[in-house]
Amino acid sequence: MQRIGLVLLSVPGYSETFFRSKIKGLQANGFEVLLFVFYPPKKEEVLPCEVFVSPPFNGRIFSKSVSVFKALLQLVFSAPFRSKTLFELDRSDGKRWATCFKNLLSQQFIMSKKLDWLHFGFGTVAVGKENLAKAMRAKMAVSFRGFDLYLSPLNRENYYSLLFKKAVTYHVLSLEMKADLIAKGVDGTQIHVITPAIDTSLFKAGHSQTTSSTLRILTVARLHWKKGLEYTLEAMAVLKRRGVAFEYTVIGTGDELERLLFAAHQLGISAEVRFVGKQTPKAVKEYMIASDVYVQYSIQEGFCNAVLEAQAMGLLCVVSNAEGLAENVMDGITGFVIPKRKPEVLARTIEKLLYLPSHQKIGLKKTAINRVQKDFNVSKQREEFINFYGS
């Protein structure tokens, strides 16, 4: 039985179903999964695997001192040779003595475990831990999911330069992400494209309940600037000026709620826009059943499970050309892909859907449904991850 250590900042939240699904899938196929996180989980966050939490090295002096003392004991008694190897590897990379010693202490809660694979769930989590897997004599894997590849390095020069020099097997969500890694000097044979997957038994097209003449538009997104929601609201204002009767519903939570509410107010569309907050997957499905059009007009997007769910439910989808979205939706075949940051174009595209012939709408929906069922199901993704760890 292979033991896989998955490293994340925190226990996966309600919207990060891909990690939970992956853990269950690997366990069902004979893998043992250990989860390592740096922030303690909330009481309601229950996972089907053993979770190891980093001791608190920040905060009060007493708790910090206790954590340092425990880490020193582990260093001496649990993993002395691994600790020595990690220190030497970090020093050979030119890291300062203080940084090397800090790494020794902060990574002890992982280092003391025997693993076949050490898989960092985001590129950002691997920074500063580039030598940990080698010191543990484990294979190293890193997933890039979008923001960590495109946003995190923007204000950090050479952020991944050390990581890209190491022997790493990479997992990315799209062909574009693979091409971008290759452009940064990563060997293409080290990169595996495994797209997101959805529960196709839950998100399955049925009979729509929409009978209103009002166009029902839906978005499922974290309320974050990268989701392009302000541009989407501007497009809704254009639709209103053109006399299109619509209702726009946004599912999700985030720090941008107040800003978006004010934007809707200033644009004069508060009556047409609803922010309904966090919803369960079953509730999301009900919102999709009651909708006509799905919009994901992100500025940056790794791939987006919600777009897959919307296609599986038979919604007409309009998305931006941000990274993986252009592979998620096939332009003119399963939906429409348009340039980002162009609200007028978004409004025109949505309005155009009103006048599409019925046979064309049906064709788009059927093609999208069949493609998602065939290519983006959980069973296929699980098989691909089994092959990934067999590489």
Descriptions of predicted regions:
Residues 17, 21, 215, 219-238, ...:
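A conserved mid-protein helix/loop that constitutes part of the nucleotide-sugar donor-binding site
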Residues 176, 197:
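Carbohydrate-associated surface elements
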Residues 261-279:
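Nucleotide-activated donor-binding/catalytic signature segment of Leloir-type glycosyltransferases, i.e.
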Residues 272, 359-375, 381-387:
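A short, well-ordered alpha-helix in the C-terminal region of glycosyltransferases
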Residues 278-279, 286-291:
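Short alpha-helical donor nucleotide-sugar binding micro-motif in glycosyltransferases
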Residues 299:
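Aromatic "clamp/platform" in nucleotide-sugar-dependent glycosyltransferases that forms part
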Residues 316-319, 329:
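Short hydrophobic beta-strand element within catalytic cores of glycosyltransferases
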Residues 331-332, 336-343, 352-358:
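Conserved acidic donor-binding segment of nucleotide-sugar-dependent glycosyltransferases
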